[in-house]
Swiss-Prot record:
The chain crosses the membrane at residues 2-22. The lineage of its organism: Eukaryota, Viridiplantae, Streptophyta, Embryophyta, Tracheophyta. Cytochrome P450 enzyme (CYP) which catalyzes a unique two-electron oxidation cascade on abieta-8,11,13-triene to produce ferruginol, an intermediate in tanshinone biosynthesis. It is a single-pass membrane protein. GO terms for biological process: diterpenoid biosynthetic process. Ferruginol is a widespread diterpenoid metabolite that serves as a bioactive natural product in its own right, and has been shown to exhibit a range of activities similar to that of the tanshinones such as anti-tumor and antibacterial properties. It therefore contributes to the medicinal effect of danshen. This is Ferruginol synthase.
């Protein structure tokens, strides 16, 4: 307790010096007045992506925000996003790293946070050319088909008993099963099981601790003290998940040593084992276990959120639901599971998913970037060390880009070639440039196929339609922005 006055004094001095030094700069992007010490933090509210979108209408597409002592520039237009992510992509390739990400040295090992150097390039090459190649995705689609059948069986049981389906819960378990099948040829969880809840606790523990507001991220002087216990809790959850992944990998390595001529499996783990045994890259086993942690946590949270929003929008817009059902019926017929190879024949399904990503980007501010050197953008100075947040939410709802941006209208994409693969800066749910999400090929397959399975096989009605509009409008900010109220809808077998 005796050290507290000294700590408080140092904290105040550091924050004041930082504040005054930034006030002296005359060529920063405009923004709201920052108060000493706290900056603009008191203005953010529960949904900062919405607040930033409103403020950008006043201050412009490049906006200065002070989050404590962390100077941040908010990017809110496709033109400025292209400047940051493409034209000056090398300068803005750094990462602002939250304290929680230091757990188990994840910040030093994960491809998502490694500097753009040799290790990062090797990991990127493996992801692009081997793990997420078209050949790899096609080889593992049979595994995913089995897990979609389990989703179908679960919903059928709910329909038979007249129970509502918690779409978030069903989407979460299905996403974990689809990912564990693709990564490990195994089933991570089952519906309504104890193992499900244990695995869910670990995954959500990691996602929650990474997304929780942490004073030490905004005031780095506090990091050694970990005042909220974020780092300590992150070490626990990261450690549990890494232990599970390492168990899968060690089991496969041992199996390959014992029986080197055994038939190969069509999962990612087989690719990883081959790479490790070939010793082709200067990478260690932990690079791959941390990559799989990123895939599990990022993929489960974003896909779960997007599937729930897709079903929420379709239930609230029955004419769009009917059109999608008709398209699925015309292509899949009486087949219960729509084949992944049928995707090019399903333009309306693709349009629905694009529209969901436009209105509800799962990570509305994307992963933070950091300026590696001073850089001028659009006539403004962005100093070295600045955190960069791309407001995909604001871009997706900008009326100068989209007609009736608050309206769910998949038809807007039927004659529009805009895609979310990183080349069109109007739609950036997976980012763009050298830091684009490496798991996008798997994530998009999961999202399209899970949504198609739910829509194709059942009609749906709300469990309680008295609060439907308010529930649909509410958002809960985190690593991914969820519905504030979980979507519960009753499945009805189509007659």
């Amino acid at each position: 307790m005796d050290s507290f006055p000294l700590l408080a004094a140092l904290f105040f001095i550091a924050a004041t010096i930082t504040f005054l030094s930034f006030r002296r700069r005359r060529n920063l992007p405009p923004g709201p007045f920052p108060y000493p010490i706290v900056g603009n933090m008191l203005q953010l509210g529960a949904n900062p992506h919405q607040v930033f979108a409103k403020l950008s209408k006043r201050y412009g597409p490049l906006m200065s925000i002070h989050l404590g002592s962390l100077y941040t520039v908010i990017v809110s237009s496709p033109e400025m996003a292209k400047e940051i992510l493409h034209r000056h992509g090398q300068v803005f390739s750094g990462r602002t790293i939250a304290q929680a990400v230091h757990a188990c040295d994840h910040d030093k090992i994960s491809m998502g946070f490694l500097p753009v150097a040799s290790e990062w390039r090797d990991m990127r090459k493996i992801c692009k050319e081997q793990m997420f190649s078209n050949q790899s995705m096609e080889a593992s689609q049979g595994l995913r088909r089995q897990k979609l059948q389990q989703l179908l069986d679960h919903v059928q049981k709910c329909s038979d008993s007249g129970r509502a389906v918690d779409i978030r819960e069903a989407a979460f378990i299905t996403t974990l099963n689809l990912m564990s099948a693709t990564l490990f040829s195994s089933q991570a969880t089952e519906f309504d099981s104890k193992a499900t809840m244990e695995f869910k606790e670990i995954i959500e523990g990691v996602a929650t601790i990474v997304g929780v507001p942490n004073f030490a991220d905004y005031f780095p002087i506090l990091r050694p003290f970990d005042p909220q216990g974020v780092k300590r809790r992150a070490d626990v959850f990261f450690g549990k998940l890494l232990a599970k992944i390492e168990g899968y990998l060690n089991e496969r390595l041992e199996s390959k040593r014992a029986n080197p001529n055994a038939p190969k499996k069509d999962d990612f783990l087989e690719i990883v084992v081959d790479i490790i045994q070939a010793n082709e890259f200067k990478l260690k086993t932990h690079h791959f276990t941390h990559l799989m942690l990123d895939l599990f946590v990022g993929g489960s949270d974003t896909n779960t959120t997007s599937i729930e929003w897709a079903m929420s929008e379709l239930v609230m817009n029955p004419d769009k639901m009917a059109r999608l059902k008709a398209e699925l019926k015309s292509v899949a017929g009486d087949e219960k599971i729509v084949d992944e190879s049928a995707m090019p024949k399903l333009p309306y399904l693709q349009a629905v998913i694009k529209e969901v990503m436009r209105i509800h980007p799962p990570g509305p501010l994307l992963l933070p970037r950091k300026a590696e050197s001073d850089q001028e953008v659009n006539g403004y100075l962005i100093p070295k060390g600045t955190q960069i947040l791309i407001n995909a939410y604001a871009i997706g709802r900008d009326p100068s880009i989209w007609t009736d941006p608050e309206t769910f209208d998949p038809e807007r994409f039927l004659d529009n070639k805009i895609d979310f693969k990183g080349q069109d800066y109007e739609l950036l749910p997976f980012g763009s440039g050298r830091r684009v999400c490496p798991g996008m090929p798997l994530a998009t397959r999961i999202l399209h196929m899970a949504t198609a399975t739910l829509v194709h096989n059942f009609d749906w009605k709300l469990e309680d339609d008295s609060t439907a509009a308010a529930d649909h409008a509410g958002e809960l900010f985190g690593v991914a922005v969820r519905r504030a109220v979980p979507l519960r809808i009753i499945p009805i077998v189509k007659s």
